[in-house]
Amino acid sequence: MSLPSSYTALLNDLNRDVARARPADALQFCANWFNSKLEEQRRAHLASNTNFATTNASTPFSHNSVGPSDIVDFGGAAPGLASPTQRASLFHSDPFAPGAGGGALPVASLAVPMDASQSPDSTPAPATPAAPAAPAAPAAPFSSLGGSGSTSISNAAFIPPTFNLGRRTSVSAESMAPSAANAESDGSPLPKTVIPKSEEQMQRIRGSIGNNLLFRNLEQDQYRDVLLAMKEVKVDANVTVIEQGAQGDYFYVVEFGTLDVYVRSPDAVSEGAPSASALLGDKKVSYGPGSSFGELALLYAQPRAATVLSTSACTLWALDRITFRSILMETNSRRRALYEKFLMDVPLFERLSAAERAKISDSLELREYSRGEAVISQGERGSEFFIIVEGDAEVRKTKQGGEEVVGKLSRGDYFGELALLNNAPRAATVAAAGATDDARLRVVTMSERAFTRLLGPLAGILERHAKETYGDEYSAVHANANADAATSVNSAALARSGADTSFPHPMDSSAKPGEGAWSAPNPFA
């Protein structure tokens, strides 16, 4: 006995979405997926209902009203989206496919039924107290979309998305957190979204977003991931790319074509049956190749402030909010874990709690240096601490009028940690090194002022741990001894390189190897 074709098609769609999303909870994902399909079916049924179509005929920007031929609608997020790494299943269909613009109405556009005599902003009269009654049965999940209930949306007026635009609203964002459950079975992260682009296209996108505040301070790897994740969207002439008052999900960069921007006054909808030009509003500006718009949609789901209408065939590059935020969050999560691992290897920080190390890692600032450029110079006052994230560095010391290389540093090594205790002069010069001229040194840095602002004076933290370990009478002595035992340059890295480590300690310029602060033991070792 053969299975119905609709059943087979439904299972194929489910298998496709499961393969894309790779849900941690397959049962919950399937339940949400079928509920979403059921809701789409009910909504499509209502859209074809005669009463609903008649009521909706006078609504501006509806699927059967006058105006632009199509309205771009990317749809909602896929059900069961457990984390941003599952963004591949966020959108179910191509919004620019033929016929996509005039499809089913979005859920957010379905208005709540209300009495004909009640305006959207009016306050209902208080209800007359009634005798206690038995608890009401739970409402059916799709009762508001039609059925046997006493109220039906097919009998209510359809309210345009701009009816409540002037009222104060709350701004919120999706809750997102990187989860190990969304990684591959071997523990590696899910593959990134990469859409091929030519170098010329990459350059045009860089030029369009280079001065945008959202992208200006992105790190190099984040910036590259954002560019690669943008997808190409082709739009015909006279298509509404974004509509004023609709929820925004996408940021666009114009590669080819022209678009006009219109802004409609809040009371334009209530002025009888306006023309198509009145519904669009006043033309404010035109966009051409290299322009960008919709960047606020990358931050939160806020209604669009204007309508953008294509005046010719256009090629756009689109980036959705979930992809953008997940790129930033996944990158920041990996970087934070890397920084915390580095901090655990620094003797001054080994007794900090996990929460304290997390605060420090979040405040570290990334810097880059070209080959031969000095990071710190011998003799200058130190106020910052450095950890090498990528690249190599040389430790140089001036001896008898000449500069000599006394050590080499690489990924994970640190230097300048005593700057968090005092502003003693630097004991050596640390400069970027590399095998090629284009080699780069990437370090993260933290100032003594930032450390004190987050955790308080480092000397106080050392004294606290000494007190916990040795008691009150030894706290100050051991805290000072621990501070004296630290070196301004990572001596472990110098020992590995076989370099001479006998330059004076920065806290005591008169000390010699084996004497004074240089040989002070570490009480926390």
Swiss-Prot record:
UniProt keyword Repeat present: yes
Any one GO MF annotation of this record: cAMP-dependent protein kinase inhibitor activity
Keywords: cAMP, cAMP-binding, Nucleotide-binding, Phosphoprotein, Repeat
Positions carrying Phosphoserine: S170
GO BP: adenylate cyclase-activating G protein-coupled receptor signaling pathway; cellular response to glucose starvation; cellular response to nitrogen starvation; negative regulation of Ras protein signal transduction; positive regulation of transcription by RNA polymerase II; protein localization to bud neck; regulation of cytoplasmic mRNA processing body assembly
Biased composition range(s): Low complexity: 124-146
Name the record gives this protein: cAMP-dependent protein kinase regulatory subunit
